[in-house]
């Protein structure tokens, strides 16, 4: 056994003690087989909690669904199950979606959905009517400085509200972050050059290459955190200066570094991000784990998963195997909801 492996083995009881102190994992919905029912999902992705319900992108069912956290009953919010681009101007449940990846709500209760394969961001208003906010339905890059509904996107994956209230879009296929002013409907590029190049530490977001900007989230103070999928890294974006700071990942794909500085750890295609209790939680998809970066110490640890693909067993978080998790969301109590995508489950890690 080499020195690094021996050290990791020696530290495992320490990690386990931290995670197991009252923590357990259980399944909220899903039984391990793909399907569409109150007990089944089919490749869940982005998710969030709102008004007593868990909203999630049921990717291969081409729907947005809501799971009532008390009754455990699932209802449709958007999508009719058909993989297409239809329904603008009508009820969201009558329209078609095409690989919905992530969703977010504004303060008024309107929902926004990033549809990867329609190359659009859709809006579902409080009355359940659907419209297209950004994108034309045709992949490309165009439209900056004009109406977002006439601009082209290429495989948008993630959306979030920035510190100034604009809706930020991770336009992954264009290696850019776009921003839509909701008051005017205009779109612009705020980060990325379109080049698939390494992202330098300490550079300004605007005009800097972004290697696969997959997910962006914002903290209460306006600080943003960005997952670079192809870059295998997490960056912090300063709210005032717009400067990118390298937070985690060496840039090389892998699964290593637990118990040490996050900057020295290897990540494996990070996708979902969420914030809670001075920590950044990430779905490290290709290592089949959920990892935590402590914002005070800079140390990274695994909080769920073993690093080996599988399905359970529960309830021990460090013995429960995952299968390519994509979505992760922390509620106000610190409970962590995980879209265990290819296990066809949504799990919750209780604080």
What is each model feature region?
Residues 54-55, 110-112, 166-168, 223-225, ...:
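Conserved beta-propeller blade signature
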Residues 326-351:
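Blade-level signature of beta-propeller repeat domains, shared across WD40, Kelch, NHL, RCC1
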